[in-house]
């Protein structure tokens, strides 16, 4: 039996490793065993190019990714140069490059890095590329390689509720006007596009709006991963993540043309999205532009424009933090960029409850503690049933050991006698595991709530914990967690299998090492959960002890 248990433990451990590796790859991270295409490109390619001569081709068929080769207009010998317009609101500081009318830099003024500087979402330099672009396809028309002229006007809100930046370009008889409207207290920029045919023949342009980004991860951790890459949403196909690796391998696909949905670039805590005008038919595309540069976009045909006529259309550009309630109000499905994985059905109500607790306590750290306590109380009956079953199994250990010794040469007879013993004593050998298994998805869902919630960024708890989204600077919480895990292990019945016993002794050390690098909010959750489990186990053992004493007294 011992060798069988050892084999089962090996299989179980390997399954966990493979599941973890699959989770890593699902989030666009590298496999632990095989280098991905994006890994190999990142190793061999220079920094992501910020070249602008990569105008997309019109989509030939809906539902297919754009070809990997750059298409469209011929590339100029030198990159165009334009004016950098700096727009400042109460939420963002944006840089608009008139060379292409591109949003080439965006700082989130109320979200800060560890050094206190604003988070930079859009950026274009020699080391990083992430920008929002738009233009026209259909002949040599104004696009994101064309130099625009900016209309003079205010560049800061200065008490106003909104400000507009208007850019104009004329090319081959077509005038293209982009107007960006920035609003007070908002991460949404309204985009108005007007196309005028100043020529003598009809034109049929297609408007494109895209997000271009290098394939580098914002964060790197060996112990937890979050998705970085494009995403597409439609009413029919719902939320669809696309990994950079799939784009590089030509495996990416996009939904069919529709009148709903949006495209986004997603990373930990933040996202950007182009949201086209509702009711206008459009198609989607994803593409690898350079070895480490990718894009996701929308193409919207504007129909035939007669000479002298003008066609207008609107869109919205979101760029900001993944605040769930804010995203829900912008457009259907946008809150899904906050990725809870396959446990969304559990994670969303848990976050709702966490928000409610924060409304009372006004501190995310205490809210995490309160939520963990509530969950423990809800599951207390299941835990009591589990410990009761394990207690019965412990009482049967001497008789089970005797059966194993008597029939160690006859596994079939040994198993039959074991089952007879379970039936006689009314014990379910899985009774101690099933209640715990039921609880596991809830605790995993809470783990992902805490990992993905931007509200934890910069949120203090008490004393030395000034930011629940970064590791404990003094490693106090991981050490407390190690001690609590060790105590919890000692309180549990010693497994009869020596291999299991060794694993149970080593686990506190392994987990403690991992949690040294985890965000403090996650470690706080595990510490509180462990301490409550110890208290719960003591109380249940006390209750079971009283029950045994009463039973002995009656007999």
UniProtKB/Swiss-Prot annotation:
Which Pfam families does this UniProt record tie to the protein?
A: 60KD_IMP, YidC_periplas
Domain of life, per the record? Bacteria
Topology of the protein relative to the lipid bilayer: Multi-pass membrane protein
Q: Name one GO biological process term.
A: protein transport
- GO CC terms in record: plasma membrane
Keywords in alphabetical order: Cell inner membrane, Cell membrane, Chaperone, Membrane, Protein transport, Transmembrane, Transmembrane helix, Transport
The subcellular localization recorded is: Cell inner membrane
- The residues that cross the membrane are 7-24, 341-361, 364-384, 430-450, 468-488, 503-523
> Annotated region Disordered: where?
61-81
For molecular function, the Gene Ontology terms on record are:
membrane insertase activity
The main place the protein resides is membrane
Q: What CDD domains does this protein map onto?
A: 5TM_YidC_Alb3, EcYidC-like_peri
Where in this chain does the entry annotate a coiled-coil region?
Answer: none
* Function as written in the Swiss-Prot or TrEMBL entry: Required for the insertion and/or proper folding and/or complex formation of integral membrane proteins into the membrane. Involved in integration of membrane proteins that insert both dependently and independently of the Sec translocase complex, as well as at least some lipoproteins. Aids folding of multispanning membrane proteins.
Family according to the record: Belongs to the OXA1/ALB3/YidC family. Type 1 subfamily.
Question: NCBIfam families of this UniProt entry?
Answer: PRK01318.1-3, yidC_nterm, yidC_oxa1_cterm
Summarize subunit and interaction data from the UniProt record for this chain: Interacts with the Sec translocase complex via SecD. Specifically interacts with transmembrane segments of nascent integral membrane proteins during membrane integration.
The molecule here is called: Membrane protein insertase YidC
Q: Which gene encodes it?
A: yidC
């Amino acid at each position: 039996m011992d060798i069988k248990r050892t084999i089962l433990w090996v299989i179980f451990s390997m399954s966990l490793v493979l599941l973890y590796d699959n989770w890593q790859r699902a989030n666009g991270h590298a496999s632990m065993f095989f280098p991905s295409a994006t890994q190999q490109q990142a190793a061999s390619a220079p920094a992501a190019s910020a070249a602008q001569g990569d105008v997309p081709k019109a989509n030939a068929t809906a539902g297919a990714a754009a070809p990997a080769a750059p298409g469209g207009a011929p590339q100029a010998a030198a990159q165009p140069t334009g004016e950098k317009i700096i727009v400042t609101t109460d939420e963002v500081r944006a840089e608009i490059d008139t060379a292409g009318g591109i949003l080439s830099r965006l700082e989130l003024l109320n979200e800060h890095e560890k050094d206190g500087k604003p988070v930079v979402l859009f950026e274009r330099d020699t080391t990083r590329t992430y920008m929002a672009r738009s233009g026209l396809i259909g002949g040599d028309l104004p696009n994101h390689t064309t130099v625009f002229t900016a209309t003079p006007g205010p560049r800061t809100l200065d008490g106003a509720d909104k400000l507009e930046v208007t850019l104009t370009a004329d090319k081959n008889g077509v005038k293209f006007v982009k107007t960006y409207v920035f609003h007070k207290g908002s991460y949404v920029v309204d985009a108005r596009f007007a196309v005028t045919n100043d020529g003598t023949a009809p034109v049929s342009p297609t408007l494109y709006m895209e997000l271009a980004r290098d394939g580098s991860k914002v964060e790197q951790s060996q112990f937890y991963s979050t998705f970085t890459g494009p995403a597409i949403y439609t009413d029919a196909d719902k939320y669809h993540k696309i990994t950079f690796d799939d784009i590089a391998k030509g495996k990416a696909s996009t939904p069919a043309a529709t009148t709903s949905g949006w495209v986004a670039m997603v990373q930990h805590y933040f996202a950007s999205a182009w949201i086209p005008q509702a009711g206008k038919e459009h198609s989607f595309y994803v593409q690898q532009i350079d070895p480490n540069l990718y894009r996701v976009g929308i193409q919207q045909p504007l129909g035939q424009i007669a000479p002298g006529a003008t066609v207008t259309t609107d869109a919205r550009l979101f760029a900001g933090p993944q605040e769930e309630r804010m995203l829900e109000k912008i457009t259907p499905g946008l809150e899904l960029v906050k990725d809870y994985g396959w446990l969304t059905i559990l994670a969303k109500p848990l976050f709702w409850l966490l928000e409610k607790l924060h409304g009372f306590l006004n501190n995310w750290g205490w809210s995490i503690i309160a939520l963990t306590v509530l969950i423990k109380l809800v599951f207390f009956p299941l835990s009591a049933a589990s410990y009761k079953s394990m207690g019965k199994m412990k009482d049967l250990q001497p008789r089970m050991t005797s059966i194993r010794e008597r029939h160690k040469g006859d596994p079939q007879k040994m198993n039959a006698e074991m089952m007879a013993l379970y039936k006689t004593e009314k014990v379910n050998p899985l009774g101690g595991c099933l209640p715990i298994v039921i609880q596991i998805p809830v605790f995993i869902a809470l783990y992902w709530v805490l990992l993905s919630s931007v509200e934890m960024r910069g949120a203090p708890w008490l004393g030395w914990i000034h930011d629940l989204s970064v590791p404990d600077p003094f490693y106090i919480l991981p050490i407390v967690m190690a001690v609590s895990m060790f105590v919890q292990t000692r309180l549990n019945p010693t497994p009869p299998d020596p291999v299991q016993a060794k694993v149970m002794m080593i686990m506190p050390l392994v987990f403690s090492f991992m949690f040294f690098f985890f965000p403090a909010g996650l470690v706080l959750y595990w510490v509180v959960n462990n301490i409550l489990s110890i208290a719960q186990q003591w109380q249940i053992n006390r209750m079971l002890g009283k029950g045994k004493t009463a039973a002995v007294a009656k007999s």
